[in-house]
A protein has these predicted regions:
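A glycine-rich, acidic short-motif signal
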Residues: 1-61, 65-71
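Short glycine-rich or small-residue beta-strand-to-loop segments that form or flank ligand, phosphate
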Residues: 6-11, 123-125, 166-172
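Conserved active-site and cofactor/substrate-binding residues in soluble primary-metabolism enzymes
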Residues: 17, 21, 58, 119, ...
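Glycine-rich phosphate/pyrophosphate-binding loops
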Residues: 31-45, 141-158
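Glycine-rich beta-alpha junction loops
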Residues: 40, 79-82, 171-173
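Phosphate/diphosphate-binding glycine-rich loops and adjacent basic-rich segments that engage nucleotide
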Residues: 44-114
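Secondary-shell segments that build the walls of catalytic and ion/ligand-binding clefts
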Residues: 92-154
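Catalytic-core signal marking the mid-to-C-terminal active-site face
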Residues: 142, 153-248
Length: 248
């Protein structure tokens, strides 16, 4: 608010959770927000382009800007081909994953989510253009690991200690906020007015698909696969609260 731009680093933290939550806080305050996170000195899950062993984290990147849209104009994605959670979800559902997401312990492409054990996620761009995801993930390590003093690589005896880099930019320091918000909304509509490609239902602005899903789940509830539900039930029973939560 005072100096128009601010940045900070965080390290030796636990899991950051939903990374977009922090840029969205900035957007609601009339600022552009950005957040980057790495996996600290914890075990890695992503093989750099051209390699078969994990040396990078999924290192997500999130940004959000103020707008007059119904939903937030934002992005939040891993710099790997896919977030690790989607691999675990496919395994829990007994489903295969698309080819190009993971490699097994021998560096071979696999569609079996269980192959991630001893294998690795591929970087954003997959086997063909993964150098792009590798570059983004490596920059994430610099901002969240080296700039913070946390370091890089794996410390086997260390605790979970992720790093973060966050920045907020006051829009009013550059342009009137109301004008900026209007222009972002008009830009989003300009994108949505793009003639759809064959087989496409149309273009969505960044963050729109999550906004649609949030409204739907708010009205209809959140779908949870059986394997996860059983785990939750077991934890509730272990804690003596299964009946109170409706598991019994």
């Amino acid at each position: 608010e005072t100096h128009n731009i601010a940045a900070c680093t965080v390290f030796r933290q636990g899991h950051v959770g939903r990374l977009a939550s922090y840029p969205l806080m900035a957007a609601r305050a009339g600022m552009i927000g950005m957040a980057w996170a790495d996996s600290g000195r914890s075990p890695k899950g992503v093989a750099p382009f051209g390699g078969r062993a994990a040396r990078l984290g999924t290192n997500p990147w999130a940004m959000a800007v103020p707008s007059d849209l119904d939903g937030p104009f934002c992005m939040d994605f891993a710099t790997s081909a896919v977030a690790m959670g989607k691999i675990k979800l496919a395994e829990a559902r007994g489903q295969e994953v698309p080819r190009g997401w993971i490699v097994d312990k021998d560096g071979e492409l696999s569609t079996d989510p269980k192959a991630i054990a001893g294998g690795a996620l591929l970087p954003l761009g997959g086997p063909g253009e993964g150098y792009k995801g590798t570059a983004l993930a490596a920059m994430g390590e610099v901002f969240c690991g080296i700039l913070t003093g946390l370091g890089f690589g794996v410390e086997p005896t260390g605790r979970h200690n992720d790093g973060c880099f966050l920045i907020a930019i006051k829009v009013d320091a550059f342009r009137p906020l109301l004008t900026f918000r209007r222009d972002v909304a008009e830009f989003a509509q300009y994108l949505k007015d793009t003639p759809p490609a064959k087989g496409s239902s149309g273009v969505l602005y960044p963050g729109e698909v999550e906004h649609i899903a949030e409204r739907k789940r708010g009205a209809e509830g959140v779908e949870i696969e059986d394997a996860t539900w059983k785990k939750l039930g077991a934890l509730a029973a272990e804690g003596g609260i299964a009946e109170r939560l409706g598991f019994a």
